[in-house]
Curated annotation (Swiss-Prot):
GO molecular-function terms, A-Z: beta-galactosidase activity
Signal peptide: 1-29
Lineage, highest ranks first: Eukaryota, Viridiplantae, Streptophyta, Embryophyta, Tracheophyta
Coiled-coil ranges (or none): none
Gene3D superfamilies named among the record's database cross-references: Galactose-binding domain-like, Glycosidases
Catalytic reaction annotation: Hydrolysis of terminal non-reducing beta-D-galactose residues in beta-D-galactosides
Family, as annotated: Belongs to the glycosyl hydrolase 35 family.
Principal subcellular localisation of the protein: secreted
Descriptive protein name: Beta-galactosidase 10
Amino acid sequence: MNRVTTESIASTAILVVMVFLFSWRSIEAANVSYDHRSLTIGNRRQLIISAAIHYPRSVPAMWPSLVQTAKEGGCNAIESYVFWNGHEPSPGKYYFGGRYNIVKFIKIVQQAGMHMILRIGPFVAAEWNYGGVPVWLHYVPGTVFRADNEPWKHYMESFTTYIVNLLKQEKLFAPQGGPIILSQVENEYGYYEKDYGEGGKRYAQWSASMAVSQNIGVPWMMCQQWDAPPTVISTCNGFYCDQFTPNTPDKPKIWTENWPGWFKTFGGRDPHRPAEDVAYSVARFFGKGGSVHNYYMYHGGTNFGRTSGGPFITTSYDYEAPIDEYGLPRLPKWGHLKDLHKAIMLSENLLISGEHQNFTLGHSLEADVYTDSSGTCAAFLSNLDDKNDKAVMFRNTSYHLPAWSVSILPDCKTEVFNTAKVTSKSSKVEMLPEDLKSSSGLKWEVFSEKPGIWGAADFVKNELVDHINTTKDTTDYLWYTTSITVSENEAFLKKGSSPVLFIESKGHTLHVFINKEYLGTATGNGTHVPFKLKKPVALKAGENNIDLLSMTVGLANAGSFYEWVGAGLTSVSIKGFNKGTLNLTNSKWSYKLGVEGEHLELFKPGNSGAVKWTVTTKPPKKQPLTWYKVVIEPPSGSEPVGLDMISMGKGMAWLNGEEIGRYWPRIARKNSPNDECVKECDYRGKFMPDKCLTGCGEPSQRWYHVPRSWFKSSGNELVIFEEKGGNPMKIKLSKRKVSVV
């Protein structure tokens, strides 16, 4: 028998054994219970260190490596929300393909030998469009989101039941041999419950009862729910949860969201949370009896298409997480936390079974000590002083504790880790640009829309309508158009002066066109959504067209009665006429939903849309309302790819019909003269999102993640819709190179 045949048989035999072992393991049922100390999975108490990875914020081709990188980082569980509006885009019509293949994602977690924490919600917040709730539900009569009313409860229970039954069918809950060990109903409702009165309390209790009745065989949680009933576990979200205690003494201490960074908005600066402070918060939590901890986010990913919420949340949801948006470890954060996890797990049994005592060792100094009957001992030494390093005596040995740090001593003698002493390597990140290339020479196809109504108006009203109630979020865009007649006797025509256009809007953004010429843009921001525009306008004698393109930039995703938050214009007037101010608010307005190219689906591969495209090697610059199409080759190498849009204004991008998302390299500005950006972050002291900000005067998002799996080997169709004007010749594909230093 030749060598090739022998090796083939051996390989096949090994594969059969591996498949058998995995199959045996995957069907091994494990009951999940809990007491005040921890979860018990099967017959073993376990500490859980979980990594949040939202399946629709990456692509299926990335899921295995993301899960594996989390496992290599010392995590033993993956957590995700379930995204209702992605799964039920219309009533009773479900979708589980592509990025929304939740079953495939959970099975990848299972194949990695990890646990799964599933937060079904189905309200999720998450800086996700409309908090994950389908927009259509707002228009079901009698519906108030997250409140005690029949329509909301009917659809919430219906979706929850559908998801639970799907996962039961796939045997994904732990008692069935699956990886799911915990589930969550609702999300941070405690913040808002009082705003709904007694009905809020009834709804919270109903939510818990409805969830428990699903009989999934694993515990249910409610985060930030201080009146959670005995049947569910109340849990903590925040930057620090060491002082948290569940609302009844029989429940374990669970931290559902530790924020290792923060989200970003278009026009906002870059928030940073140092690795030392993240590690400090985790060590304090486990030192104080915590047993389940989840990083929100461990990999933030990307808000592809129109999925970002806020409004104004960027397409990037990087979150400065341990795994970056592109799927690469962020060093030193990933490495430092890996070292922390290893140190914590050295004392796993003591932390969940041993006797806990707390000792004061001096001003702002304390020790949390765990022992068992055999004399085994572990200690967490904390320096709570946010300015001064300190020497501390513990069991006749001196230890040096930097300010705001925790040392872990798994044997009460040897310091194996200190949260402020970073030994992990760091990384240098570069975005290496490549010009767009085509196998047959780069040729652009260009189609420019005319401002205002195309075809027939959708409707006409003598008032300004709410943007969201009109579009129902089927598009970002809504045209408000009207016209005025200017007498040749107006003084401003004779003097050569300009009247002033005044516009007020509830948000989010507006492009103004006068007589088909782009006049300018006005916008809100992530901290103040409404805005006003005041701009001189050139009018002529006779008829003048006023075309206003209102845009949403993601819908509100949280807050009491947030579904009632509107957008769009509330008043329009022009000052400077002979008779004073011309109020156009109640004039005759014609409306059109969306832009023409959307309706024609020009973003679909090979779709000409029955419009006349101009073919050119030099596409026009600074031209608003323009569609650009170009066929390109994939960039060289295998590194992750970002689309560099620094030369463009604002719009949407697609590759081979896949939605890259909104682009807007809006400059990050200070909110007030007192706001500052920093060069270095001081980890010491309590973290808040505005504590350590960088990026003043820089684009809030320059690069837009394009997953490698979206590229074909050749002939890739890149489509850009530019709203206000840019230079497409300078668009580049940049490869993300990370070097360890």
